[in-house]
Amino acid sequence: MTKHWLIGGLLALACAAGAAGPEEDVFLRPVGQPPVAKAQRRQGGESLPPLPLPATPLRRSEQKHPPAPTTLIGKVIWGGYLDYTWPNGVVSRVFDWNMVPADAQQLLRHLKGRSGLEYQAVTLDLGMLSGDPAEVPVLLFSGGRSISFTPGERARLRKYLLDGGMVWFDSVAGSPFFSRSAAGEMRKILPEAPLRRVPADHPVFHLAKSLVAGETNRSKAQPFELEGVFLGPRLAAVISPVGLGCGWDNARPELIADARYYKPAAAVDLGVNLALYAVGWFDSARRYAAGESEAEPGTANPEQVPFAQLVTDGFWNSDPGSGDRFLRYLGRNLKVNTSGSVSYVNVDRAELSDYPFLFLNGLGDFTLEKPALEKLRRYLDDGGFLLVNNTMGLAEFDGAARRFIARLYPEKKLGRIPADHVLFTHGPYKFADSGFTAEAAARYPGETFPLLYGVSDGDRLALVYSPVDLAGGWQQVPRPGSVMYLSSVAGRLGGTIVTYFLTH
């Protein structure tokens, strides 16, 4: 990483190439109270005589230390430093990576107090990183000035993220220089995964405590904001443009005039949620890393029932591998002859009639242009079938899906599929309850049956929409906070939908 070394005086800047400019240096200041100057000690003429040693050595018993807790956070060393001279003459050296030295430790102390989970934080250099996220599941980069990585470090971080690790970027005092540079680095590390605003109903805001707004030094109720990079449904990297570390350690950056940071209660609330998300989603991250997401697109075979997933302008591949796992479920449990892997098709270019079953998955907003929409409508009118699924059951995709369906069928209404519909009454499975996770039950209280919506073409359902995530259940790994069906129900409900399609 580029090193910006700064030394000396009241606040002196080294002139080495690549050093940060003065406008950035104002965000690298000591955080907290000034250290107390050492008292001057004068030697007097008298002193105490040496104390006598005991005649017999005191017995000492070996103290047994319990094993160290599992590591959760690795705070990464990067950048350079500034020397700041306080009015009392004391000089504080402030490092880019360590403006709040106890931030991670204090966060984990709060995590233990709230959840009972005990973890430790370690300090590491990227050169020390083994690359195995099981050893250090979270990397924390904090700072006030611009951060940059070498090509080798970017490659190492890319592998770490794809293997299931999570990266946090904390702007400490709300430095725009740090946040913007972190965003730029993530675009270089994972160019295929654009940075997105994390939606307000995302699990990371609702795990330990449901968070909407928190107190900052500038606002009593600032809406929580995170920028994130998603790998599949998993939030792999987050950037907090409002500082977190000051609040974790109950410190105030009073020397930074333009500081913007969460007060302790809000910072700890969000930090604990982030930590629980990293812990709870680790198995899902490892599933993605294991290669389930890398299945090759299937090819149509006249002896098999081909299934295709639609490519849109949005985050269409929001749950890689889920479709393939579902097809294997169909083959094992319902003896449906499939290719074993899903084809990925673009409405504009594909011959849709080759694929009698289409699947549309998503996270966030999306749209289809009018020609593609008209082509898809002709396909459905000719007997095709479309299943739309809401990854993690979030509100943004729900709104986008309903707008899309309204444009696709302007003359029809999307309606609830009742329990006495033939899809359920003649299906291979019966449902005694909703099959929701706790989060889905909280989102849709009072539901006692699976929640599906549909659009009919005469007596036949041509389109089915699930606002509660089906595909997450097909993956059969924990996804805390997701509005989804239980794994035991998701496969059976998907099988019921496919059985209806095959028989109608």
What is the meaning of each model-derived region?
Residues 20-138, 144-145, 244-245, 254-357, ...:
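Aromatic-Pro/Gly-enriched surface loop or interdomain linker
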Residues 5, 138-179, 357-398:
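Short alpha-beta junction capping motif
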Residues 44, 69, 81-87, 105, ...:
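An acidic, glycine-rich "communication" segment
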Residues 10-19:
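Hydrophobic h-region of N-terminal signal peptides that target proteins for export
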Residues 74-75, 137-141, 166-170, 194-197, ...:
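Structural recognition of the beta-strand scaffold that forms the well-ordered cores
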Residues 1-9:
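Bacterial N-terminal signal peptides that target proteins for export
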Residues 116-127, 169-173, 193-201, 284-290, ...:
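Surface-exposed patches in mature extracellular/periplasmic domains of secreted proteins
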